[in-house]
């Protein structure tokens, strides 16, 4: 088996579950040493680390609340102490609230934008300062910014901001050979998928199913390798034809 990321190092925020977990496992399967960033669920993060270790890989988990700049700095410090200077950063941490905009509170706004926008901002800021030349930055967005789901105004607004971070940062880091891209999944089997939407979501795809986290991870794995060297500043749809 080929290991296109052998000798590379990666940090994945929100890496303990769902799409982040799948990306962590995928990059590790390609030979990368992986650090998992998580907020609350230590048990899940440790499970990912164990799964990677059992397969012969190197991994570690670090708790951090990325809405606080000092926590982002600490996460990167711990990652570098564990695996060395970073080649790949995946900003995947996210939260969602589903309710009409008129019913959203300031607390809802702060919670969603703290995680999805501010947390990504601080992650990208540290990545821009620390990533090796020729590195990779991958940001999780959502196909919802193209599909316009009602009740997700805060979530979609927070992700729309992130997509613009990607476009601007790709130009800021291009002279160092660093690629910066977003992935926008369609409906995917994660904790965010509500049972009442599952059948309708599956019908949006020509494949008549919702995505598996591994489907999204495959796109990240491509972007992280040398094969993705000429792709930057893009928001790549991974929705199984749903948009």
Tell where the protein language model's regions lie, with residue ranges.
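Substrate-binding pocket helix/loop in short-chain dehydrogenase/reductase
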Residues: 100-101, 105-113, 201
């Amino acid at each position: 088996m080929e290991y296109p990321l052998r000798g590379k190092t990666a940090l994945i925020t929100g890496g303990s579950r769902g799409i982040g977990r799948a990306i962590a496992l995928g990059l590790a399967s390609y030979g990368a040493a992986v650090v998992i960033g998580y907020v609350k669920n230590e048990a899940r993060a440790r499970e990912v680390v164990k799964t990677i270790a059992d397969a012969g890989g190197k991994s570690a988990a670090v708790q951090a609340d990325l809405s606080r700049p000092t926590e982002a700095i600490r996460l990167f410090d711990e990652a570098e102490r564990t695996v060395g200077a970073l080649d790949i950063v995946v900003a995947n941490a996210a939260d969602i609230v589903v309710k009409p905009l008129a019913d959203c509170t300031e607390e809802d706004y702060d919670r969603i934008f703290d995680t999805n926008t501010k947390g990504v901002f601080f992650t990208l800021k540290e990545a821009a300062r620390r990533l090796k030349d020729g590195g990779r930055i991958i940001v999780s967005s959502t196909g919802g910014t193209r599909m316009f789901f009602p009740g997700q105004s805060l979530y979609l607004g927070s992700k729309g901001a992130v997509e613009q971070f990607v476009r601007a940062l790709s130009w800021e880091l291009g002279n160092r050979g660093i690629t910066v891209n977003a992935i926008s999944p369609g409906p995917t089997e994660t904790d965010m998928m509500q049972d009442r939407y599952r059948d309708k979501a599956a019908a949006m795809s020509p494949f008549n199913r919702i995505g598996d986290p591994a489907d999204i991870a495959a796109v990240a794995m491509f972007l992280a390798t040398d094969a993705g060297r000429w792709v930057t500043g893009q928001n790549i749809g991974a929705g199984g034809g749903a948009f």
